[in-house]
Amino acid sequence: MAPDEEVVDSPTGWVAKHIQEYVESGGKKGHRWQGVPTLLLTTRGRKTGTLRRTALIYGRDDGSYVVVASIGGAPKHPKWYLNLVDDPMVQLQVGPDIMSGRARTTEGDEKERLWREMASIWPQYNRYQEKTDRQIPVVVIDPV
């Protein structure tokens, strides 16, 4: 991802506002949202090639970042998740720190363990899983 590439932020109103505050403050504002840590994830659009940015709750696992592709328990995966499945190279902003990362979807015991950890941060994830037929992915992003 080139530094001069245009980035399109989430069109969802409250998410766009969150991203704007996060970016404009250099990560000083917006890193915590409703008492939980959030990061900004930038993926490359799988159809357009456009860089797309969203804000997500995150956890840590050793030196990696963990996010959940819940979209509130919607019936389909979020677009950011489909984008990183297609191209796992992403960019993160965590507070003031900006870094590149490689994303991967967890499975089996690792997914179960990280799901529990993420649900301890944001308990609504369990409700989201109950209301959808799809298995909500848990994604690990390793800084590179």
Predicted regions and their residues:
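A generic local structural motif
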Residues: 26-28, 53, 126
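Short beta-strand segments
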Residues: 36-72
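A generic structural micro-feature
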Residues: 33, 48-50, 84, 133
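Short, structured beta-strand-loop surface elements
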Residues: 3-5, 71-125, 131-135, 143-144
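Short hydrophobic/aromatic beta-strand or adjacent loop that forms the aromatic wall/cage
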Residues: 38, 136-138
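Short secondary-structure boundary/capping segments
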Residues: 30-31, 57, 82
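Extreme N-terminal tail/first-helix region
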Residues: 1-34
